[in-house]
UniProtKB/Swiss-Prot annotation:
PANTHER family: 30S RIBOSOMAL PROTEIN S18, SMALL RIBOSOMAL SUBUNIT PROTEIN BS18M. Keywords: Ribonucleoprotein, Ribosomal protein, RNA-binding, rRNA-binding. One of its GO terms (biological process) is translation. GO terms for cellular component: cytosolic small ribosomal subunit. It comes from Limosilactobacillus reuteri (strain DSM 20016) (Lactobacillus reuteri). This is Small ribosomal subunit protein bS18. PROSITE patterns: RIBOSOMAL_S18. Binds as a heterodimer with protein bS6 to the central domain of the 16S rRNA, where it helps stabilize the platform of the 30S subunit. The keyword Translocase does not apply. The keyword Ribosomal protein applies. It holds the Pfam family Ribosomal_S18. Belongs to the bacterial ribosomal protein bS18 family.
Amino acid sequence: MAQQRRGGRRRRKVDFIAANHIEYIDYKDTDLLRRFISERGKILPRRVTGTSAKNQRKLTIAIKRARIMGLLPFVAED
């Protein structure tokens, strides 16, 4: 028997930062930054989070600063 393809339109991801009118991404705001980090401690890509290119660059800088300051871990603990 032939398999039926199930498909639908994928919902477009919304930029969380732009949607909530966050103008400045602060490296001390670890609750916000943790939304964009995987369980392993890696920075999630744009295609997963839906952030714009500009906000992704700001996020990356803020996450790296928070790691250096010791606010976020470089890798997850097992």
